[in-house]
C-alpha cells in the first residue's frame, strides 16, 4: 500500500474531482430557462446541455480500463481532470449552443473517466476490512453534488450568472489535479497493453449519439411521423447491434456483456437503472415544473431537491450496519417501497409550495440512500475478484446512460400529457362556455398551469407503480449473495463485505 502520509491527498483529490464531475452535471438541472436565455435558445434545447453531458459521461467510463492499463492511474486522472477543466472553461465563455454542447461533452468524458477510476483507487488504497465504508464514501462523493448542485446552480444563476457555476469550478479542478498528482502513485503503465478497440468505440459512440438525437428531437419532429426520426432511430438500433456483435467477438472488448448471463447481475442492474433513471428524470423535471408553473426562481427550484440529500446522506452512512441487520435483498426491496411511497404521496396543485413537496422528496431521499450499496453488492455477487473491475465498468456504463433515458422520457411524457390535458380543458371550456370574468390570456395561463400539474401527478402515479413492481421483483427474484457462495469459490469483495457485517 502507498505511503500513508500521502493517502489524504489521494482520497481528497480524487473525491473532489469525482464530486466536481457530478456537480457540473447536476447544477444545470434547475436553471434550464436561465441557460436558454444565455444561449438564445429554448428550454427544450437547453435540456441538451444536461443530456449530452450524461451520454459522454457514460462513454468516458468505457475508456477507463484500457487507458489506465496503458498510461497508469495517475496520468489518466490528470488527463481526465484537465479535459473536464478545459470543457468547464469553454462552457463559461461560450454563448453558442453547439459550442456549449461540445464543451459539455468534454466535461462528461472527463467525469466519466473519473467514476470507475476513483472507485478503483479508493478500494486499492484501503484495507479490505474498510471496503464497505470506502464504497459508502465513494458513493456519497458522487451523490451529494446531485442533491446540493441544483440549489447552488440556482443561487448563482439568480444572484450572479449561471456561468459562475463553471468559473467557480475551475480553481477546484486545479486543486483536485494537484492533490491527485501528489497522492496517486506513479507507474502502472504497460506499453504492451492490447490495442484499444477503436472500431467498437466508434460504433458505440455513433449509436449512442443517434439514440440521443432521437430522444432529444423526437418530440420536436413528431416522433414516428418524421422520416428524420425514423432514420436516426433505425441508425441507432443498427449501430448498437453492430457494437454488441463486435464486443462478443473482439479479443479485448470495451464492455463485457457476458456478465449479463448471471441473474443477480442483469436483474440487479435493471433495478439499479430503474431507480437511478427515475431519480435523475425527476431531478430535472421537478425544478423546471416549479419554475414554469409555480413561479419559483432558479434557486427555489433547486432547493426542492435538498430534502433528498437530508435523508439520503445519513441513510447511506448506515448501510454497513443495515445490510448486516436486514440483508441486501430486503434492503433493495425496502428501497423501492420507499420510492413508491415517495412518488405515491406526491400530489400537487398549481398552488403547491415547498411544504407540500418536502415530504415526498424526503421519502425519495430515504430510498435513494439505500439504492447503491445493496444493489451494487448484489450485482457483483458471484463474480470472482479478478473480474470485478470489468463487471463494474460495464454496470457503471449502463447505469449512467440509463439516466439519460430517464431524463428524456420523463420530459417527453410530461410535455405530451400536459398538451393532452390542456386540449381536454379547452374543449370543455368551448363546450360549456366561460362563465368567469377572466380575460382570455389569464384563463389560458390557468389552463396551462392545471394541465402541466395534472401531467406531473399522472407521471408520479406511473413512477409509483413501476417502483412497486421493482420491489416485488427484488424480493422474489434476487438471490441473496450468501446463498450463491460455494465452498472453494474465488473470494470477492462482496463475500468479504458480507462476512464483515454478518450479525452475531
Predicted regions and their residues:
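Short helix-capping/hinge motifs at transmembrane helix termini and TM-loop junctions
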Residues: 94-95, 127, 183-186, 215, ...
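Hydrophobic transmembrane architecture of multi-pass small-molecule transporters
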Residues: 395-504
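Interfacial loop-to-helix junctions that mark the boundaries of transmembrane helices
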Residues: 44-48, 98-102, 106, 159-167, ...
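12-transmembrane solute porter fold
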Residues: 7-23, 28-32, 41-52, 58-65, ...
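Flexible interhelical linker loops that connect adjacent transmembrane helices
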Residues: 2, 129, 177-205, 220-225, ...
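C-terminal membrane-cytosol helix-exit motif in multi-pass small-molecule transporters
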Residues: 170-189, 205-217, 235-249, 470-481
Amino acid at each position: 500500500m502507498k505511503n500513508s502520509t500521502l493517502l489524504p491527498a489521494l482520497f481528497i483529490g480524487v473525491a473532489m474531482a469525482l464530486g466536481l464531475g457530478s456537480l457540473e452535471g447536476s447544477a444545470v438541472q434547475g436553471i434550464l430557462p436561465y441557460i436558454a436565455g444565455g444561449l438564445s435558445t429554448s428550454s427544450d434545447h437547453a435540456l441538451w446541455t444536461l443530456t449530452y453531458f450524461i451520454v459522454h459521461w457514460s462513454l468516458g467510463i468505457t475508456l477507463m480500463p484500457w487507458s489506465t492499463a496503458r498510461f497508469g492511474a495517475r496520468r489518466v486522472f490528470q488527463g481526465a481532470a484537465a479535459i473536464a477543466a478545459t470543457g468547464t472553461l469553454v462552457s463559461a465563455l461560450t454563448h453558442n449552443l453547439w459550442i456549449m454542447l461540445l464543451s459539455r461533452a468534454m466535461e462528461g468524458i472527463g467525469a466519466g473517466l473519473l467514476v470507475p477510476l476513483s472507485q478503483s483507487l479508493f478500494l486499492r488504497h484501503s484495507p479490505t476490512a474498510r471496503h464497505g465504508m470506502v464504497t459508502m464514501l465513494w458513493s456519497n462523493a458522487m451523490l451529494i453534488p446531485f442533491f446540493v448542485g441544483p440549489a447552488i446552480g440556482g443561487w448563482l444563476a439568480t444572484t450572479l450568472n449561471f456561468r459562475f457555476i463553471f468559473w467557480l469550478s475551475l480553481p477546484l479542478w486545479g486543486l483536485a489535479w494537484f492533490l491527485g498528482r501528489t497522492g496517486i502513485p506513479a507507474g502502472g503503465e504497460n506499453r504492451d497493453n492490447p490495442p484499444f478497440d477503436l472500431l467498437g468505440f466508434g460504433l458505440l459512440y455513433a449509436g449512442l449519439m443517434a439514440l440521443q438525437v432521437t430522444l432529444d428531437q423526437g418530440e420536436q419532429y413528431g416522433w414516428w411521423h418524421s422520416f428524420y426520426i425514423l432514420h436516426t432511430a433505425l441508425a441507432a438500433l443498427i449501430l448498437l447491434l453492430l457494437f454488441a456483435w463486435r464486443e462478443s467477438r473482439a479479443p479485448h472488448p470495451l464492455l463485457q456483456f457476458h456478465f449479463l448471463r448471471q441473474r443477480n447481475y442483469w436483474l440487479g442492474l435493471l433495478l439499479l437503472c430503474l431507480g437511478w433513471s427515475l431519480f435523475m428524470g425527476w431531478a430535472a423535471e421537478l425544478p423546471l415544473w416549479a419554475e414554469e408553473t409555480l413561479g419559483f426562481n432558479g434557486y427555489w427550484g433547486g432547493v426542492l431537491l435538498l430534502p433528498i440529500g437530508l435523508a439520503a446522506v445519513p441513510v447511506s452512512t448506515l448501510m454497513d450496519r443495515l445490510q448486516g441487520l436486514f440483508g441486501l435483498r430486503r434492503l433493495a426491496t425496502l428501497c423501492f417501497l420507499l420510492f413508491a411511497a415517495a412518488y405515491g404521496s406526491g400530489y400537487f396543485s398549481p398552488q403547491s409550495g415547498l411544504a407540500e413537496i418536502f415530504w415526498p422528496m424526503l421519502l425519495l431521499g430515504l430510498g435513494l440512500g439505500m439504492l447503491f450499496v445493496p444493489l451494487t453488492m448484489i450485482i457483483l455477487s458471484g463474480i470472482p475478484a479478478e473480474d470485478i473491475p470489468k463487471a463494474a465498468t460495464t454496470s457503471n456504463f449502463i447505469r449512467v446512460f440509463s439516466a439519460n433515458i430517464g431524463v428524456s422520457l420523463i420530459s417527453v411524457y410530461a410535455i405530451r400529457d400536459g398538451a393532452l390535458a390542456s386540449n381536454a380543458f379547452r374543449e370543455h371550456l368551448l363546450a360549456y362556455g366561460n362563465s368567469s370574468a377572466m380575460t382570455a390570456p389569464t384563463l389560458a395561463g390557468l389552463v396551462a398551469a392545471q394541465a402541466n400539474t395534472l401531467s406531473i401527478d399522472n407521471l408520479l402515479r406511473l413512477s409509483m407503480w413501476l417502483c412497486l413492481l421493482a420491489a416485488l421483483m427484488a424480493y422474489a427474484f434476487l438471490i441473496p449473495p450468501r446463498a450463491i457462495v460455494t465452498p472453494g469459490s474465488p473470494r470477492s469483495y462482496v463475500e468479504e463485505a458480507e462476512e464483515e457485517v454478518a450479525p452475531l
